C-alpha cells in the first residue's frame, strides 16, 4: 500500500493586485492535528482578511475545506482541488489573504487560491510513503558482502548493522517486494539465511 503526502511543513507567498497570499502546508495524520495546524495559522495571522483551510486525512477518507468569508466556491474548493489533483493525503493547507483594496472577482480568486495552494505544495515537496516490512537477518561474515549488495538491489534499505559473532542486519523493504527478496536471499545463501519480519511501518520510498 502506498500514498502521496507532503514531505515537510513549508510556506510560500505571492502578491496579486496588492493582495498578499501566503500558503502554509504541513503533513498530518489525524483530523485533530489538521485542526490544530489551522488554529495555529489563524492565531499567527489573526489580523488577516481570510484564512482559508483545506485538508485530506487518509484514515476515514476525510476531506474538509472552508471559504472563510470569501464568495462561495472561490477559495477553499480550489485549494482542495490542488491537493486532490496531486493525489495527496494526510496533509493540511491554510491560505492566508491580506486584502489589498482591489477586488479580484470570482475567477481571479479561484486562480489566486489555486496558485497559492500550488506554490505551497511545491515548497513542501511531495513524498511517496509505502507500507514496509522491518526485517532482521543474521548471517556469517562470508555471506555479508553478498547480503549488503542484495538489499539495495531488491529495493531495501539498511537501517542498522551489528558485527558480533555473526552479522545482524536490520533493514526495511516495501511489503510487496519482501517475498521476492526473501526468495532471492534463501537462494543465494543456499538456505542458510532467512529474514525475520519484526515490524511493519509506513516509510518514505523516494
Where are these regions (language model features)?
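Terminal, non-globular segments
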Residues: 171-180
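Conserved short beta-strand edge segments in small beta-sheet-based binding/regulatory domains
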Residues: 158-162, 189-206
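Active-site beta-strand/loop microenvironment that shapes enzyme catalytic pockets
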Residues: 75-123
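C-terminal regulatory domains involved in ligand/effector binding and gene-expression control
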Residues: 1-74, 196-205
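Short, structured loop/turn "capping" segments at alpha-beta junctions
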Residues: 89-92, 120-132, 145, 160-161
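Short glycine-/aliphatic-rich beta-strand segments at the starts of folded cytosolic domains
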Residues: 126-141, 169-171
